[in-house]
């Protein structure tokens, strides 16, 4: 089979990225993140309560919910509320978002409160979970900045930034930031979450069509690190404009 050739961008290029801060007015932090044709609204809401297992422990919590609008895909999706339960995929993704954000937050400095993250996909073209993480961090940082500017917190509990991107192999070619056609036809698919200091929070990798070697995984991680560096700059630009 011939090697895959991208038409619209280089193999090591991200899709066009745009992050619009303060996208919604009725929340403590929000943004719209656009990764090519994938678009996700991310919000952060401050709650002056914590889950029961944290009461009285003088520390906070960050948790996340994720969902897709019925018309976000080519064929209308059934609302999970209509089905009466969340899918396993939805639960997996929202746990991933929460874990990724908690990894960069000092919960004691956050104090006994929680921040609720909502990621709603309004248009899907691959990479919705990674876009959600990248956008959710912007919403979280805006909400935490509000706590600091209002004098509720004396210092920012966020240790460093976090972003995520997908990488994969299509017909033997390593690619950065897969869109839906690439993702659905790839040999392997890996989602990587990384901090600004280059530390890995999570690697989710699957051989969809052909197993991959440790050497190939290393190349994919390096490719992801390049893309995440660019995403971190987009986050910084959005927050500077907020």
From Swiss-Prot:
The keyword Nucleotidyltransferase applies. It catalyses: tRNA(n+1) + phosphate = tRNA(n) + a ribonucleoside 5'-diphosphate. PROSITE patterns: RIBONUCLEASE_PH. It is an enzyme of class 2 (transferase). Keywords: Nucleotidyltransferase, RNA-binding, rRNA processing, Transferase, tRNA processing, tRNA-binding. It comes from the Bacteria. Its EC number is 2.7.7.56. PANTHER family: EXOSOME COMPLEX COMPONENT, EXOSOME COMPLEX COMPONENT RRP41. Homohexameric ring arranged as a trimer of dimers. This is Ribonuclease PH. It comes from Neisseria meningitidis serogroup B (strain ATCC BAA-335 / MC58). The lineage of its organism: Bacteria, Pseudomonadati, Pseudomonadota, Betaproteobacteria, Neisseriales.
């Amino acid at each position: 089979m011939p090697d895959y050739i991208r038409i619209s961008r280089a193999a090591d290029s991200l899709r066009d990225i745009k992050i619009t801060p303060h996208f919604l007015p009725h929340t403590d932090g929000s943004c719209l993140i656009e990764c090519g044709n994938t678009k996700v609204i991310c919000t952060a809401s401050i709650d002056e309560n914590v889950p029961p297992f944290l009461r009285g422990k003088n520390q906070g919590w960050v948790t996340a919910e994720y969902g897709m609008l019925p018309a976000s895909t080519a064929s209308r999706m059934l609302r999970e509320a209509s089905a009466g339960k969340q899918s396993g995929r939805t639960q997996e993704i929202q746990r991933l978002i929460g874990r990724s954000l908690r990894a960069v937050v000092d919960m004691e400095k956050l104090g006994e409160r929680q921040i609720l993250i909502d990621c709603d996909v309004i248009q899907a073209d691959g990479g919705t979970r990674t876009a959600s993480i990248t956008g959710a961090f912007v919403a979280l940082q805006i909400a935490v900045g509000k706590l600091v500017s209002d004098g509720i917190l004396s210092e920012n509990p966020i240790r460093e930034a976090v972003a995520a991107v997908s990488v994969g192999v299509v017909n033997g070619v390593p690619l950065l930031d897969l869109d839906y056609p690439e993702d659905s036809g790839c040999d392997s698919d890996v989602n990587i979450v990384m901090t600004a200091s280059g530390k890995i929070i999570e690697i989710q990798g699957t051989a969809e069509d052909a197993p991959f070697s440790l050497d190939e995984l290393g190349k994919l991680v390096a490719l992801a690190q390049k893309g995440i560096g660019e995403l971190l700059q987009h986050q910084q630009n959005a927050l500077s404009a907020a």
